[in-house]
């Protein structure tokens, strides 16, 4: 049959039971061996023959017990490697798996994560960028032979909540001393094979993508991958619920969208402020400005663009803090200038009185003054007539 030239096929399909091809599980020939002329009457799970587009192919179809491994074949794809194409409302990219060392692939992923500043919400786009470069994961999928796979990306018109940039994805801080998050490594399985569970509900889609670790003093690179979000969701839910039960959540942490770089309010209140509440107010204004503009980068597709936006916001926040501190310093300087002016006027009046007293006093009266007062009165004597 003409199954070797399927259109927009992105999954390994199974052949009927009467297939007698001599191929092996990892056969490199793209065209399929000849099969019976008529349409196959059945599939391993009893469903009808799939259409040429591959939409009727059962995803969960498994061969009967005792079936040989040659029942699987490699489907040749008409698209080139890394070329995106539309499949319904999804944009798909097909990737061939190659022999790539797992340590080097892990180092590459760590390098990408480090270069993007610990972004975890863009894991899906990072995989797609790797797919466009022709790099695929070395870990085979369970139940499928080594062949072409595809990773799906939602269309740009309706971005899913899973692919959030780390600038606006921070939900709540769990309070000082309790924010410990362990980021699981990137998974090699596609997003559609995420195991369902109670921990993958709405709370898993609104996980914070960047957390501040108070105990360890570091930044945790945020959202777990889609296929292993179950454990991460349970951890984060426990950490977000425990402070609310004990009533120790700071009031500043109840915002739905907080900036990625977050200053703890307790540190601001505990630190000595020489200028009163001006510095704390400036920090709160900077945090609110970042919180308002943090969600603007949630649909940004480029990690570098989001990093540039974050740098610009940090610079704006620092300028705002600097301006508020300058206002406080100017007020203090004005107060000190007034005090210096008053002291100078009082000093001038005292010097004038001293000069008059010295001019009117007799030598006998000056001789009766204590010896300790002479050094103080000596320098001011020549200034008496001038005043």
Curated annotation (Swiss-Prot):
The modification Phosphoserine is found at residues 62, 165, 187, 189, 254, 258, 271, 362. Residues 28-51 have a biased composition (Pro residues). It comes from the Eukaryota. Residues 1-85, 135-232, 368-387 are annotated as: Disordered. One of its GO terms (biological process) is response to osmotic stress. It is found in: Nucleus; Cytoplasm; Cell projection, Dendrite; Synapse. Forms a homodimer or heterodimer. Forms a heterodimer with TSC22D1 isoforms 1 and 2. Interacts with NRBP1. Belongs to the TSC-22/Dip/Bun family. This is TSC22 domain family protein 4.
């Amino acid at each position: 049959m003409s199954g070797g030239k399927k259109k927009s096929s992105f999954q390994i399909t199974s052949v009927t039971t009467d297939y007698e091809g001599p191929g092996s599980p990892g056969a490199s020939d793209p065209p399929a061996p000849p099969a019976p002329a008529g349409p196959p009457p059945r599939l391993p799970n009893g469903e009808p023959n799939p259409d040429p587009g591959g939409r009727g192919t059962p995803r969960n179809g498994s061969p009967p017990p005792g079936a040989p491994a040659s029942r699987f074949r490699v489907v040749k794809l008409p698209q080139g490697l890394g070329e995106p194409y539309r499949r319904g409302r999804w944009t798909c990219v097909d990737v061939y798996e190659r022999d790539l060392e797992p340590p080097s692939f892990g180092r590459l992923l760590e390098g990408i994560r480090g270069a993007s500043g610990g972004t975890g919400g863009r894991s899906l786009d990072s995989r797609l960028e790797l797919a466009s470069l022709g790099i695929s994961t070395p870990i085979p999928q369970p139940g499928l032979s080594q062949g072409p796979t595809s990773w799906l990306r939602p269309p740009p018109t309706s971005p899913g909540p899973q692919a959030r940039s780390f600038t606006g994805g921070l939900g709540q801080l769990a309070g000082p001393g309790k924010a410990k998050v362990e980021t699981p490594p990137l998974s090699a399985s596609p997003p559609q094979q995420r195991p369902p569970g109670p921990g993958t509900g709405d709370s898993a889609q609104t996980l914070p993508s960047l957390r501040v670790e108070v105990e360890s003093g570091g930044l945790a690179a945020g959202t777990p991958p889609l296929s292993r979000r179950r454990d991460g969701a349970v951890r984060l839910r426990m950490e977000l619920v425990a402070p609310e039960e004990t009533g120790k959540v700071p009031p500043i942490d109840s915002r739905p969208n907080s900036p990625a770089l977050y200053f703890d309010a307790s540190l601001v209140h505990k630190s000595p402020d020489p200028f009163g509440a001006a510095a704390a107010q400036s920090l709160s204004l900077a945090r609110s400005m970042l919180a308002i503009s943090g969600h603007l980068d949630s649909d940004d597709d480029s990690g570098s663009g989001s990093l540039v936006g974050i740098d610009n916001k940090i610079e704006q926040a620092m300028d705002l803090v600097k301006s508020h501190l300058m206002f406080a310093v100017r007020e203090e300087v004005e107060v000190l200038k007034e005090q210096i002016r008053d002291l100078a006027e009082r000093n001038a009046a005292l010097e004038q009185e001293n000069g008059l007293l010295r001019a009117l006093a007799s030598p006998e009266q000056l001789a009766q003054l204590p010896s300790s007062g002479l050094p103080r009165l000596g320098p001011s004597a020549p200034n008496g007539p001038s005043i």
